Swiss-Prot record:
Protein name, as recorded: Glycine--tRNA ligase beta subunit
PANTHER family per UniProt: GLYCINE--TRNA LIGASE, CHLOROPLASTIC_MITOCHONDRIAL 2 (PTHR30075:SF2), GLYCYL-TRNA SYNTHETASE (PTHR30075)
Originating organism: Shigella boydii serotype 4 (strain Sb227)
Catalytic function, reaction form: tRNA(Gly) + glycine + ATP = glycyl-tRNA(Gly) + AMP + diphosphate
Taxonomic lineage of the native organism: Bacteria, Pseudomonadati, Pseudomonadota, Gammaproteobacteria, Enterobacterales
Predominant subcellular localization, coarse grouping: cytoplasm
UniProt key word Ligase: yes
Length: 689
């Protein structure tokens, strides 16, 4: 069977840059599924994406489905015919479904009986006939949150569509996709190359688009070119470009023919905190800031034009003129804000609502101030500095700079606090209170900052859960999952002596009578333990290891982490599987017994050598391991407990637990309970698979 290259290109108006990659990757994934479901043999499915097009190129696509033999078994002969030999309704219905009469059916005979059988040779459908529906289905499944409709038609898509190119080899596949008749026409760059041209063969793509249309259709190629050219441009001016992945992706999605240029701004603007300047350059203008080797911001920026100009200086000057007023605004706001102390913004917090049932930002500030001080006392941080940081934590939200450049919240608080002469750890805490903002983000760097960051997040968790607005499904408007994971990361990675139980109780207490959920403390703790599950799964821990630790519901995050590492190490020991099975057996035995057990094993009642040996080792280990448990040395404890494998195996091989002698039975059950309690001091290893 011959093979050909297939090309589909959807030509549109400018697509949303932040969604471009996800759109085309979904398109490729959907279409690959369609090909596989149809049984069409194919090679690589390559995707292309540019601001005004989504395209797929499939190598070595079979021209038709393979022929196939089908068999459909019908009713058993006993049910297929009545006593007079006439076909039953079941047989006739089955035959109709197969497109035959009962008389045309074959018979299938096995040692289990005889059935009606339909056999047929089905010729594979041509790829040309299948492709239009496959393309349409793949496009219909794209993750588009908001569809557009254009013109008088009822067609909906992410942006208006102008061209649809469907080529199988050199042949146009006739179809109407998204209201457009397929053709071999492709549109080039708006201002360079040929605005419109025809493509003779799918194999010519994307080279023909580059040569005639001046469009680099390969997304990764554009991105790599921007990165390399920007690095070289920065090197020429003695700096390093800030090429964050997210901005690189966005810029690559905005241009069809990237041309990297370097511009500058007035050095006087460097007196403004770099974060505000960078926010303007990256967030508003999509420019790449440039830093000197010492990490200081240079008065330059790199940007990407979408055209090759005979006079690039004109483009550079235009971009410099655009950014100058924004930088001047930042300078004005910075100077204006510093005319009063940060603390002077406190009264204005009373005018901003945090949440309707939970009060204003000033109310939240008071709670954070108290909670940060309480946390500082628990972890040995400076209580006065922590309460001071709590008091000032939201003041920068009322400044001109943060109002205009919202992403500078926190960092501007730090700069204004430094200007006011606040303690260094207080100022740093104002900046770091929102950390970690995302997975892998840095944690607060000092104890005061840790106290403030935890207080801010716990106040939100307690409040929102306290009014019954916890996350549901994918909806998490208050980012509670991120807040919970942030608290856990800070406590675990900084090894802080905090208990979720008392921490949550204190956060709830500070709300007074505002909360309506009587189970708020348990709900918050359960939610946070659930985030532990997700975190450790991402870290590569097995589900049963996590469940074994969660079964003990440890509420000290650092303690939880120590248990996780201990159980994970325990699983590598030779004795692990046998002891996990033994614990499961002990758990089942104890669960089936409703008898009241003694507080201790009666040594005089022990009879068999195996139970005497096991009982003695349990007593010895109980005393030996007590300091291990007190110090959180769970890994060492489980290594010691692994020595019980031999006496436990011997006990179950030689000793019957559920004997008729009640005194003997209860004594053996008590011993097993004491054995299990030792393991439960760490985790429920009976849950290990």
């Amino acid at each position: 069977m011959s093979e050909k290259t297939f090309l589909v290109e959807i030509g549109t108006e400018e697509l949303p840059p932040k969604a471009l990659r996800s759109l085309v990757e979904s398109f490729a994934a959907n279409f690959t599924v369609e090909l596989d479901n149809a049984g069409l043999a194919h090679g690589t499915v390559q995707w292309f994406a540019a601001p005004r097009r989504l395209a797929l190129k499939v190598a070595n696509l079979a021209e038709a489905q393979p022929d196939r033999e089908i068999e459909k078994r019908g009713p058993a002969i006993a049910q297929a015919f009545d006593a007079e030999g006439k076909p039953s309704k079941a047989a006739e219905g089955w035959a109709r479904g197969c497109g035959i009469t009962v008389d045309q059916a074959e018979r299938l005979t096995t040692d289990k009986g005889e059935w009606l059988l339909y056999r047929a040779h089905v010729k594979g459908e041509s790829t040309e006939a299948l492709l239009p529906n496959m393309v349409a289905t793949s496009l219909a499944k794209l993750p588009i949150p908001k569809l557009m409709r254009w013109g008088a038609s009822d067609v909906h898509f992410v942006r208006p569509v102008h061209t649809v190119t469907l080529l199988l080899g050199d042949k146009v596949i006739p179809a109407t996709i998204l209201g457009i008749q397929s053709d071999r026409v492709i549109r080039g760059h708006r201002f360079m190359g040929e605005p419109e041209f025809t493509i003779d063969n799918a194999d010519q793509y994307p080279e023909i688009l580059r040569e005639r249309g001046k469009v680099i259709a390969d997304y990764e190629e554009r991105k790599a070119k921007i990165k390399a050219d920007a690095e070289e441009a920065a090197r020429k001016i003695g700096g390093n470009a800030d090429l964050s992945e997210s901005l690189l992706e966005e810029v690559a999605s905005l241009v069809e023919w990237p041309v990297v240029l370097t511009a500058k701004f007035e050095e006087k603007f460097l007196a403004v905190p770099a974060e505000a300047l960078v926010y303007t350059m990256k967030g508003d203008q999509k420019y790449f800031p440039v830093y000197a080797n010492d990490g200081k911001l240079l008065p330059n920026f790199i940007f990407v034009a979408n055209i090759e100009s005979k006079d690039p200086q004109q483009i550079i000057s235009g971009n410099e003129k655009v950014v100058r007023p924004r930088l001047a605004d930042a300078e004005f706001f910075f100077n204006t804000d510093r005319k009063k102390r940060l603390e002077d913004n406190l009264p204005r917090l009373q005018t901003v609502l945090f949440q309707q049932q939970l009060g204003t930002l000033r109310d939240k500030t008071d709670r954070i101030q108290a909670l940060a001080g309480w946390i500082a006392e628990q972890i040995g941080a400076d209580v006065n500095h922590a309460t001071r940081a709590g008091l000032l934590s939201k003041c920068d939200l009322m400044t001109n700079m943060v109002f205009e450049f919202t992403d500078t919240q926190g960092v501007m608080g730090m700069h204004y606090a430094c200007h006011d002469g606040e303690a260094e750890d207080v100022a740093v805490a104002l900046n770091e209170q929102y950390q970690p903002r995302f997975a892998g983000d840095d944690l607060p760097s000092n104890p005061v900052a840790c106290a403030l960051a935890i207080a801010d997040k716990m106040d939100t968790l307690a409040g929102i859960f306290g009014i019954g607005q916890h996350p549901k499904g994918d909806k998490d408007p208050f980012a509670l999952r991120r807040a919970a994971l942030g608290v856990l990361r800070i406590i675990v990675e900084k090894n802080l002596n905090l208990d979720l139980q008392t921490l949550t109780e204190e956060a709830v207490r500070l709300y007074g009578d505002k909360l309506t959920n009587a189970n708020v403390v348990d709900d918050v703790i359960d939610f946070m333990l659930g985030r532990f599950r997700a975190w450790y799964q991402d870290e590569g821990y097995t589900v049963d290891t996590i469940q074994a630790v969660l079964a003990r519901r440890p509420t000290r995050p650092a303690d939880f982490d120590a248990r996780m590492k201990a159980v994970s190490h325990f699983r590598t020991l030779d004795a692990a599987a046998a002891l996990a099975a033994a614990n499961k057996r002990v758990s089942n035995i104890l669960a089936k017994s409703d008898e009241v057990l003694s507080d201790r094993v009666n040594a005089s009642t022990l009879k068999e050598p195996e139970e005497i040996k096991l009982a003695m080792q349990v007593v010895v280990l109980r005393d030996k391991l007590e300091p291990y448990f007190a110090e959180g040395r769970y890994q060492d404890a489980l290594v010691e407990l692994a020595e019980l494998r031999e006496p436990v195996d011997a006990f179950f091989d030689k000793v019957m637990v559920m004997v008729d002698d009640k005194e003997l039975r209860l004594n053996r059950l008590t011993m097993l309970e004491k054995l299990r309690e030792l393991f439960l001091r760490v985790a429920d290893i009976s849950l290990l698979q």
